[in-house]
Swiss-Prot record:
Organism from which the protein derives: Acidovorax sp. (strain JS42)
Gene: dctA
Assigned keywords, A-Z: Cell inner membrane, Cell membrane, Membrane, Symport, Transmembrane, Transmembrane helix, Transport
Lineage per the UniProt record: Bacteria, Pseudomonadati, Pseudomonadota, Betaproteobacteria, Burkholderiales
PROSITE patterns for this protein: NA_DICARBOXYL_SYMP_1, NA_DICARBOXYL_SYMP_2
General function of this protein: Responsible for the transport of dicarboxylates such as succinate, fumarate, and malate from the periplasm across the membrane.
Protein name: C4-dicarboxylate transport protein
Length: 450
């Protein structure tokens, strides 16, 4: 086992509230909203701060994923565990992604948020959505599969394709495990490199309030507070549906696995506020991986489930896609039969797998879905373009919580979860616990040989 052992540190003193990240992010968001509302020109000019923070996060995502996966897989006693963890994760993703699509479809049929608008498609300004539609044409299933394979071993680290990094990391980790003792020096080096990389994550996260401020000031300055209430019924329906999905559906699976989804949300409050401020679940990916390990999830499970979930487990995006598609159909008086809705569901199941956890990806994925389902006019997307930016925040929050729950659940299924540590961390004792060993527990994972 390649772990960094250390004595348990003395109990630390709880930081004052104003030094805690979640308070700083909340304060920054409020200041951003006020600046964007009262000085919209200055607010819109704050966009570079948000963009800069997102770039900083993207800078560290690739090394965090690579090191976590490689050291986790290479430390496993049996490589069959890799395939087993991946298989269980994909089974979870498929089940709950489909359930999220169905929930959005059912809610849209029951609430009918677009009924009564009687929009004439010919009168809509289609130029605003042309860019999204053109991008959606590139999102074919074959193109998505081929895009996972990088041109070189180095190219994933200079791009922003998480799945390419994941593929290279898995292959390298498996190769390192197969060479046995000959690969031990490399594994020791990568193990040692993990600690400063996660320290770098902590340093970058200190800039989170600045990034949240810039992103929120730009949003309000650009679109105005009035856009928050525009098409209020659709937005409200989406927010309520997502909240019910998290509390009821994810809450039920969490209870079945012995933990509380509300306590998990409280534990991740700083990351959730960051996601809220930036409208990108990707902005908190490195921090999520670190916190899931601290909560008792095995390193190998975290390394496989979290990055994969960012493309295959997007509950919020799935709810949004079917809900928004039916809203457009209702608003344009387009009648969809049960067969049409089932076809929409099947297409969305495929197209949603290519959505990344970045701002605007959900809208592009919706365009890709509607392009394949001719019954719903793609031009109708102009109806929701104005409020999509604010729905993006809810999508990202739901996606983020869904991946956090998935990580704990798959760890539990693998018997690779320190349940006692999880409960203590979720009860607020995280800062009084020693750091978990950075390496995966290969003995625990090996209990379930295929």
């Amino acid at each position: 086992m390649h772990a960094i052992s250390s004595a348990a540190p003395a109990p630390s003193v709880r930081l004052p509230f104003y030094r805690q990240l979640y308070f700083q992010v909340v304060f920054a968001i409020i200041i951003g909203v006020l600046l964007g509302h009262f000085q919209p020109e200055y607010g819109a000019a704050m966009k570079p701060f948000g963009d800069a923070f997102i770039k900083l996060i993207k800078m560290i995502i690739a090394p965090v994923i690579f090191l976590t996966i490689v050291t986790g897989i290479a430390s496993m006693s049996h490589l069959s565990a890799v395939g087993r963890v991946f298989g269980k994760a994909m089974a979870y993703f498929l089940t709950f992604s489909t359930l999220a699509l169905v929930v959005g479809l059912v809610v849209a049929n029951v609430m009918q948020p677009g009924t009564g608008m009687h929009i004439n498609v010919a009168e809509l300004d289609q130029t605003a959505v042309k860019g999204y539609v053109s991008k959606s044409h590139e999102m074919t299933l074959t193109g998505f599969a081929l895009d996972i394979i990088p041109k070189t071993l180095i190219s994933p680290f200079v791009g922003d394709n998480i799945l390419q990094v994941l593929l290279v990391a898995v292959l390298f980790g498996v190769s390192l495990a197969m060479v046995g003792d000959a690969g031990k020096p490399i594994l020791d080096f990568l193990d040692g490199l993990t600690k400063p990389v996660f320290k770098l994550v902590n340093i970058v996260m200190k800039a989170a309030p600045i990034g949240a401020f810039g992103a929120m000031a730009f949003t309000i300055g650009k679109f105005g507070l009035g856009s928050l209430v525009n098409l209020a019924e659709l937005v409200l329906t989406f927010y309520i549906t997502s909240a019910v999905f998290v509390l009821v559906v994810l809450g039920a699976v969490a209870r079945a696995c012995g933990f509380s989804v509300l306590k998990l949300i409280r534990y991740l409050k700083a990351e959730l506020l960051l996601v809220l401020g930036t409208s990108s679940s990707e902005s908190a990916l490195p921090s999520l991986m670190e916190k899931m390990e601290k909560a008792g999830c095995a390193k190998s499970v975290v390394g496989l489930v979290v990055p994969t979930g960012y493309s295959f487990n997007l509950d919020g995006t799935n709810i949004y896609m079917t809900l928004a598609a039916l809203f457009i159909a209702q608003a344009t008086d387009t009648h969809l039969t049960l067969g049409h809705q089932i076809a929409l569901l099947l297409v969305a199941m495929l197209s949603s797998k290519g959505a990344a956890g970045v701002t605007g990806a959900g809208f592009i994925t919706l365009a890709a879905t509607l392009a394949v389902v001719p019954e719903v006019p793609v031009a109708g997307m102009a109806l929701i373009l104005g409020v999509d930016r604010f729905m993006s925040e809810c999508r990202s929050l739901t996606n983020f919580i869904g991946n956090a729950v998935a990580t704990v659940v798959v760890s539990r299924w693998e018997n690779a979860l320190d349940a006692d540590r999880l409960h203590r961390v979720l009860d607020g004792e995280a800062e009084f616990l020693p750091e978990p060993e950075r390496a995966v527990e290969p003995v625990v994972l090996a209990r379930h040989r295929a």
